[in-house]
A protein has these predicted regions:
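Active-site ExK catalytic segment of metal-dependent nucleases
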Residues: 125, 131-142
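Mg2+/Mn2+-dependent nuclease catalytic core
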Residues: 139-160
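Domain-level recognition of nuclease-like catalytic cores that cleave nucleotide substrates
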Residues: 174-185
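Short, hydrophobic beta-strand segments that form beta-sheet elements in well-ordered domains
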Residues: 165-174
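Short amphipathic alpha-helical segments
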Residues: 74, 146-147, 182-184
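Conserved nucleotide-binding/hydrolysis micro-motifs of P-loop NTPases
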Residues: 67, 116, 140-141, 176-178
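Accessory nucleic acid-recognition modules appended to NTPase machines
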Residues: 1-130
Length: 185
């Protein structure tokens, strides 16, 4: 979530009789970071041809998405009936695994979103300057195509005079029998 602490407190107030302060909620968030329950993904700020402002708010993820599933008391059937929620937990799972792989390569995983709504779920960036753009989707041809189009739009905005082109663009999906390379990149 990119929600501010204030927004989280306001959401909690609508669902709970016991209100907490923004300061207290911020303290809880910091405690959850320290005990490795949540982790922030920083915003990626590439050199773009466009003057569109890049949003720089961190995205907060559970270290292990099963924590969120357990807190909400959800089971497999609940997730299958609510694919939007399932998609959020799937994205968290994928980001966690991408972080493990990136760390082994001395890299980091970021996210990207600009004011126009163009976003990239994960940017795997290595210390040598190479990077890859990743869209995460549960699956289905329509969503895969949307993800690929989104990555193309972002790649076209990157100022390749100031930084390299992406080393790869990937739509990471939860369904399908195999990986394949598309003709559009």
């Amino acid at each position: 979530s990119q929600a501010t602490i204030g927004t989280i407190v306001a959401d909690m107030a609508t669902n709970d009789e016991n209100e907490i302060s923004v300061k207290t909620a911020g303290g809880y968030m910091e405690a959850l970071r320290k005990i490795f329950v949540i982790e922030d993904s920083e915003a990626w700020n590439p050199n773009l041809r466009s003057k569109t402002a890049v949003r720089t708010a961190n995205t907060r993820y559970f270290i292990d998405p099963s924590i969120g599933v357990a807190v909400l008391g959800l089971g497999p059937n609940d997730l299958l009936k609510d694919l939007n929620t399932m998609g959020l937990f799937f994205e968290t799972l994928c980001v966690r695994d991408l972080r493990v792989f990136a760390d082994a390569l001395d890299g980091e995983v970021y996210h990207f979103r600009d004011r126009s709504g163009l976003e990239c779920d994960a940017v795997v960036h290595l210390r040598n300057g190479k990077y890859g753009l990743v869209e995460i989707k549960l699956g289905g041809d329509r969503l895969i195509n949307e993800g690929a189009e989104n990555l193309q739009k972002l790649a076209e905005k990157i100022n390749t005079e100031k930084m390299n082109e992406p080393s790869f663009m990937m739509v990471l999906v939860g369904t399908g029998d195999y990986a394949y390379r598309r003709t559009d990149g």
